[in-house]
Amino acid sequence: MKAYQRHFIELALAKNVLKFGEFTLKSGRVSPYFFNAGLFNTGRDLALLGQFYAQTLIDNHVPCDVLFGPAYKGIPIATTTAVALVEHHDMDVPYCFNRKEAKDHGEGGTLVGSPLTGNVVIVDDVITAGTAIRESMEIIKQHDATLSGVLLSLDRQEKGRGSLSAIQELERDYQCQVYSIITLDDLISYLTESETLSAHLPAVKAYRERYGIN
């Protein structure tokens, strides 16, 4: 695990974004951990988050001409990632986001920011059903741009109703690559090394065994 991935987990724990216990998910599954990226809610949190996303983009050599943040959670992520790329990597990347409702005055339309052209990277927090990401992919297609990847904070590596995860279904349906700052396997590695949190390891491993993708 890289230093920034460890730092991301530590920030998530400090902000209660990542918690351990028993949590009933929308799917009805009882998960031994819960991740709520909405609790990254200060300027410092966003600044660090942008650095983590930017580093993940760089490490995976993802071609990127425009960052796209799906409304609403993806908007601050796209913004802070763009800032981190220029401040820490000298990459001045435009960003764009969509409105939930079209605007019929002023500049109008459903998109705000840069035009969607070239290689577009979608940035969001996590994928559950993947609805917002699929909508974003259709928007990119309508503008004749190319989807070069999707960037997330956490990949739960968890099956949906079938044998694939929501991420794997997106990769299959849109022939795209999904990247994440950390995966559940990274979290398991962190727990294995942690003196204070290792008690949660058996439950997380059992959950991975039961619901995890191969």
Curated annotation (Swiss-Prot):
One of its GO terms (cellular component) is cytoplasm. Its cofactor is Mg(2+). It is an enzyme of class 2 (transferase). Pfam families: Pribosyltran (PF00156). PANTHER family: OROTATE PHOSPHORIBOSYLTRANSFERASE 1-RELATED (PTHR46683:SF1). GO terms for molecular function: magnesium ion binding; orotate phosphoribosyltransferase activity. Homodimer. This is Orotate phosphoribosyltransferase. It catalyses: orotidine 5'-phosphate + diphosphate = orotate + 5-phospho-alpha-D-ribose 1-diphosphate. Its EC number is 2.4.2.10. Orotate binds at F34, F35, T128, R156. Disulfide bonds: none annotated.
